[in-house]
Amino acid sequence: MRIFKSHRLLKLVNSYIIDSPQPTNLSYLWNFGSLLALCLGIQIVTGVTLAMHYSPSITDALYSIEHIMRDVNNGWLIRYLHANTASAFFFLVYLHMGRGIYYGSYQGSRSLTWNIGVVIFIVMIVTAFLGYVLPFGQMSLWGATVITNLLSAIPWINQDLVEFIWGGFSVNNATLNRFFSLHYLLPFILAALVLMHLIALHDTVGSSNPLGISGNYDRLPFAPYFLFKDLVTIFLFMLGLSIFVLFMPNALGDCENYVMANPMQTPAAIVPEWYLLPFYAILRSIPDKTLGVVAMLGAILILMALPYLDKSNIRGMQFKPLSKIAFYIFIANFLVLMILGAKHVEDPFIIFGQISTTLYFSYFIIITPLFSIFDNILFDIATKKK
């Protein structure tokens, strides 16, 4: 083990993975980081392998996917692993962010770590959208057309910007080549951002803990205690992922994407992947195109404002009954938005979408600041009595 503490590169591995001191009371909710790192590794390895056989052409893209599935050794396994790990990646990210909001992991000196995490989330969304277009089935073509057309809401440069991204007057070969290049590049940028996320976490105050207090008084090294704990959830995760990949690989996909792209025929409903549905529902809930785009972007970017909106002296919601209720309502509302994102734009879904969008923004803009002020008042009263 001496080389781990003397070698220039291995010393970093030692400080982050082996000797890194962690609070002793960390629960399994702090295991998402290792699972997300595993997902990113799987995505990069399977993605690079798929890229060796993929053809970014509007005429050959779908055929190259079928070639991978039928002719490449274990190509079906690599493709389904890539597709289902993407869903698992977002599922774990949502759990990771939800845990961060519940336990106040964005407060104080951890705000930089939180904001880098939000940037990672944005890059993930862009990467997922680009990957969704690559098979170039019906949903790929029309999804690319609809989402890129949102840029026409930008004043002055609207349609010119859209055509610049397309490389023509509609989605074509140039578009697919650009999307493929960016989809290949962004995971490596994502890996760099993950390293920045880790550096920001470990070079400040380290991991938070379920009690929301300083963990400096009682810590244990990461290995072997938390390393073994991470391995438990990694094995369980691989078991769950294997069930999806081997027994129901298309459960989270869209059958329309197995149909050759046809610019003359619009699908009955144009919907993104399930993990982007809440933001798609926010976009569609506002009739005005420009305001809808602003609301959709605001729904993501408002997460960056959370460290400045929550000024409570008590970190987390463990001992705040009202905040707990508000948080669970927020989670339920987020799931409702996910359901509404897959529905047709018609009554009563339009009204429900507008109500859910209002509740989503109200949680951050109204409820969180008010509850933090209320908590601080109660905290001051309690301390003065003592």
UniProtKB/Swiss-Prot annotation:
Protein function: Component of the ubiquinol-cytochrome c reductase complex (complex III or cytochrome b-c1 complex) that is part of the mitochondrial respiratory chain. The b-c1 complex mediates electron transfer from ubiquinol to cytochrome c. Contributes to the generation of a proton gradient across the mitochondrial membrane that is then used for ATP synthesis.
Required cofactor names: heme b
GO cellular component terms attached to this protein's record: mitochondrial inner membrane; respiratory chain complex III
Further remark: Heme 1 (or BL or b562) is low-potential and absorbs at about 562 nm, and heme 2 (or BH or b566) is high-potential and absorbs at about 566 nm.
Subcellular location, principal: mitochondrion
Organism of origin: Trichophyton rubrum (Athlete's foot fungus)
Keywords, in A-Z order: Electron transport, Heme, Iron, Membrane, Metal-binding, Mitochondrion, Mitochondrion inner membrane, Respiratory chain, Transmembrane, Transmembrane helix, Transport, Ubiquinone
Cofactor info, note text: Binds 2 heme b groups non-covalently.
GO terms classed as biological process: mitochondrial electron transport, ubiquinol to cytochrome c
Alphabetized Gene3D superfamilies for the sequence: Cytochrome Bc1 Complex, Chain C
Disulfide bonds: none
Entry protein name: Cytochrome b
